[in-house]
UniProtKB/Swiss-Prot annotation:
Pfam families, per database record: CxxCxxCC
Native source species: Vibrio vulnificus (strain YJ016)
Stored InterPro entries: Puta_zinc/iron-chelating_dom, UCP006173
Alphabetized HAMAP family for the sequence: UPF0260
Protein name in the entry: UPF0260 protein VV2402
SS bonds (residue pairs): none
PANTHER family the UniProt entry points to: UPF0260 PROTEIN YCGN (PTHR37421:SF1)
Family: Belongs to the UPF0260 family.
Length: 145
């Protein structure tokens, strides 16, 4: 049996298809984060981008997400050094830190159901930015991601 590509290649060596398949579809990167201007510490909130579907954990307009006017960031191989803001469970961050994929990752299990069952997605756990007045009230204390 051959070694999976994520174990045999660096992030920079991956094809576009391999790179895209690393995304588990959890939706955590689509949650708004706050950053302390003095310490650069990142605080996660449960406030979702208005384009995020909280049931499917995917963008409502995925093909146009970078031109929609939202603050959607494209994760690219030339930005690996900036991945510290991503959730600790994120495959891009984990591989950039030489950590293995989590056991529930779809590349390991073959589907997203294990991720949802492990509580590692944002499915039905968010509020939308349009409904929030003070984002600081929505900071997640000790997020499990």
């Amino acid at each position: 049996m051959s070694t999976p590509f994520w174990q045999s290649k660096t992030l920079q060596e991956m094809t576009e298809q391999e790179w895209e398949s690393l995304c588990d579809g959890c939706g955590k990167c689509c949650l708004h984060k706050l950053m302390d201007e003095e310490t650069d510490e990142v605080f996660y909130t449960n406030v979702a981008c208005s384009w995020l579907n909280s049931k499917t954990c995917s963008c409502k307009d995925y093909p146009n997400r970078f031109s929609s006017g939202e603050n959607c960031l494209k994760l690219t191989q030339d930005k690996i050094a900036e991945f510290h803001w991503l959730p600790r469970t994120c495959a891009y961050r984990r591989l950039s830190e030489n950590q293995p994929l989590p056991e529930w990752h779809p590349l390991i299990t073959g589907s997203k159901s294990a991720m949802h069952a492990a509580g590692q997605s944002i499915r039905n756990r968010v509020v939308y930015e349009i409904d929030v007045k003070d984002w600081e009230d929505h900071v997640i204390e000790n997020p499990d991601y």
